[in-house]
Structures are given as structure tokens and as C-alpha cells.
Design a protein with these regions (language model features):
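Mg2+-dependent phosphoryl-transfer enzymes with acidic/Ser/Thr/Gly-rich catalytic loops
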Residues: 2-6, 23, 185-270
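Asp-based phosphoryl-transfer active-site loop
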Residues: 3-19
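Active-site phosphate-binding/coordination module
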Residues: 24-125
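Anion (oxyanion) recognition and catalysis
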Residues: 31-34, 102, 171, 226, ...
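Short active-site oxyanion
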Residues: 37-41, 63-65, 153-155, 210-212, ...
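Residue-level detector of anion-binding/catalytic polar loops
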Residues: 39, 107, 176, 230-231, ...
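Short, structured coil segments at secondary-structure junctions
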Residues: 63, 71, 170-174, 227-228, ...
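Conserved acidic, metal-coordinating active-site core of Asp-based
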Residues: 100-215, 219-221
Length: 270
């Protein structure tokens, strides 16, 4: 098997318990892999700034790793605290999505391109929306009488499915959409994905996709799991992910990530 030089980890449902921190079993294997010279990065749909504490917990700042946030729309240098690569939804696309959400009575949450603000068309605090776990910045309430001036790294729409009128209309706008098992859709700029983020990092660090291991559980992990050298699905993955993975590990709650790092990195090198 090709030597693994980089491990890309999804966060929620993979390295981290759902909407929580890194599972305890995964911490030391991630650190040890980096000590052996293997690059380890998070590739997540989460926003960047509120997720950095988890990266720092496993010394990704010390080992000067990158962080793929918003499904690949923003790549962040954890050590220097700078954005090194980005691609956003345009202001016209963001305005269109809010108009569409109003038409079809959908809740929409958009992360703006300054990393500290979100635009919403509902009250997430009053509704105790689960996305609050990832954001502690400023909320801007959508006003249909005004034109939104912000670009967006990622928009989230709740309670949808593949044949939803909102999704059908949105897919005609040259955007990327991934819908998870809970019916939440993540919307990004065209050709944005975790795989696209890994391809950019590949060009910067001279690490081929065939030399990467990627672990994930949801549809926004599909393309990176399918295209890297060793794509691994969690036992708690959606079935479409298990179908294209080269291996299925155990669940997030049983340290499935740790088991794969130990098998392919820690126990495979003398």
C-alpha cells in the first residue's frame, strides 16, 4: 500500500462526538501521527474560528497544519491565523437563496465571508438551533427590503430533501448542495468540496491524493473518501458513504478514527 502522508478527518460524527469535542480516544493517536511526520488536518463543514480550539487540542498549531472549513470554501493556516485560500457564494447567490427560502418557508443560515457574522431569516437562539454550537459571533436578521452585501462561505437550509422544491430551484443556480441524513442541506460555491480543498493542499504540500487517508460519515465527505488513496467510512455513516469507502471503521463513540490511525500509521511504521 502507498505510504500515507496526510490524514484528513471530518469532525462531527467522525473525530468528534456529534456537536461536541474530539472523542478522547482520538486525541493521542492524532498527536502521535503528527510526531511521526504525517500531516493531519480537519476537513469539516464547521466554521473556522469556533473550531480552532479542537485543532489546538491535538497540536495542529504546533505542527503547522491547515484547517479546511465550510466544506472547503475556506482554508485556514492554524499557526499564522490567516486565510490561505477561499471561494465564496456571491452576493447575488446569497440574495437569491434568501428569496427562495422566503418563497418556500425555509429556515436559512448563511456564514458571511468575514468569519464573525451570520445572516439568518429566523431566531436561532429562541429555537435553540444546533448550529449555535459552532458559532458565537454576530447575528444579522435578513430583511427582504434590503439587498445583502455580504458574500458567504456556506449557507445551511433546514428540513429539506432531494425532491424539495427549494432544493430543485437552488440546484439550477450553479452551486454545490450536500444533504445529510437529518434533512439539513449545506450550500457552497460551485466546485467547492472537501476534495477540492484537499486538491489545493496537495499542490501546496506536494502530497498526492493517493498518499492521503480520509475518514468521514456524511454526504459532504463523499468525494474525498472516494478519491483519496484510502477512503474510510465510520460505522455511523450514511449508507452512500459506506458503499464507496475502501474500509468501514467503528463508530465515533468507540474511537473509530483512533483505530484507523493505529492500524495504518502507528502500527505500520518502525
Amino acid at each position: 500500500m502507498t505510504k500515507i502522508k496526510l490524514i484528513a478527518l471530518d469532525m462531527d460524527g467522525t473525530a468528534c462526538s456529534f456537536h461536541q469535542g474530539i472523542h478522547e480516544a482520538n486525541i493521542m493517536p492524532i498527536i502521535k501521527a503528527q510526531e511521526m511526520g504525517v500531516r493531519v488536518i480537519f476537513a469539516t463543514g464547521r466554521p473556522v474560528l469556533t473550531s480552532l480550539s479542537e485543532a489546538i487540542k491535538v497540536k495542529m498549531d504546533y505542527f503547522h497544519q491547515y484547517f479546511i472549513g465550510f466544506n472547503g470554501a475556506c482554508i485556514y493556516d492554524i499557526k499564522t491565523h490567516t486565510i490561505v485560500h477561499q471561494q465564496t457564494l456571491s452576493t447575488s447567490q446569497v440574495n437569491f437563496l434568501f428569496q427562495l427560502a422566503k418563497k418556500y418557508h425555509k429556515k436559512l443560515w448563511c456564514y458571511t465571508d468575514d468569519l464573525t457574522k451570520v445572516i439568518v431569516n429566523f431566531n436561532p437562539v429562541a429555537e435553540n438551533n444546533p448550529e449555535l454550537a459552532f458559532f458565537d459571533g454576530e447575528f444579522i436578521q435578513y430583511d427582504s427590503a434590503l439587498t445583502i452585501q455580504n458574500k458567504s462561505y456556506k449557507c445551511i437550509v433546514m428540513d429539506v430533501h432531494e425532491n424539495d422544491d427549494f432544493i430543485i430551484a437552488a440546484r439550477g443556480q450553479n452551486i454545490e448542495i450536500a444533504i445529510d441524513a437529518s434533512g439539513t442541506a449545506e450550500i457552497n460555491a460551485p466546485e467547492i468540496s472537501k476534495l477540492a480543498g484537499l486538491k489545493w493542499i496537495s499542490s501546496q504540500w506536494n502530497i498526492a491524493l493517493s498518499e492521503m487517508m480520509a475518514i468521514g460519515d456524511s454526504m459532504n465527505d463523499y468525494w474525498m473518501i472516494k478519491n483519496v488513496g484510502l477512503g474510510i467510512a465510520m460505522e455511523n455513516s450514511q449508507e452512500q458513504i459506506k458503499a464507496i469507502a475502501k474500509e468501514v471503521t467503528t463508530t465515533v463513540e468507540t474511537g473509530g478514527v483512533a483505530k484507523m490511525i493505529e492500524k495504518y500509521i502507528l502500527n505500520n511504521r518502525k
